């Protein structure tokens, strides 16, 4: 490469970045309403209901298992 070409490309690297004019750019981000502004109450209800059901089932199964353990080992 010729020295002038190397100097030109090197000077471009050292030159300060030029910001494009405001009229020629457009935002990459759009202003939208946040997702949490309007919760999907059906999904929230199903999630909470499923969680409550699973906890009740877990506790009930645990209590049955404890009773079975006590019965088999003669602790009750």
From Swiss-Prot:
- Its primary localisation, in coarse terms, equals mitochondrion
Q: Where in the cell is it found?
A: Mitochondrion inner membrane
One Pfam family, short name please? NADH_dh_m_C1
Listed A to Z, the keywords are: Electron transport, Membrane, Mitochondrion, Mitochondrion inner membrane, Respiratory chain, Transit peptide, Transmembrane, Transmembrane helix, Transport
**Where is the transit peptide, renumbered to this chain?**
1-27
Q: Which domain of life is it from?
A: Eukaryota
Keyword Transmembrane helix recorded? yes
GO process annotations (BP): aerobic respiration; proton motive force-driven mitochondrial ATP synthesis
Membrane-topology descriptor? Single-pass membrane protein
Q: Where are the transmembrane segments?
A: 40-59
Cellular component, GO annotation: mitochondrial inner membrane; mitochondrion; respiratory chain complex I
Its annotated function is as follows: Accessory subunit of the mitochondrial membrane respiratory chain NADH dehydrogenase (Complex I), that is believed not to be involved in catalysis. Complex I functions in the transfer of electrons from NADH to the respiratory chain. The immediate electron acceptor for the enzyme is believed to be ubiquinone.
Could you describe the subunit structure of this protein? Answer: Complex I is composed of 45 different subunits.
Q: Which family does it belong to?
A: Belongs to the complex I NDUFC1 subunit family.
Which PANTHER family does the record cross-reference, listed alphabetically?
NADH DEHYDROGENASE [UBIQUINONE] 1 SUBUNIT C1, MITOCHONDRIAL, NADH-UBIQUINONE OXIDOREDUCTASE KFYI SUBUNIT
Q: What is this protein called?
A: NADH dehydrogenase [ubiquinone] 1 subunit C1, mitochondrial
> Which gene holds the coding sequence for this protein?
Ndufc1
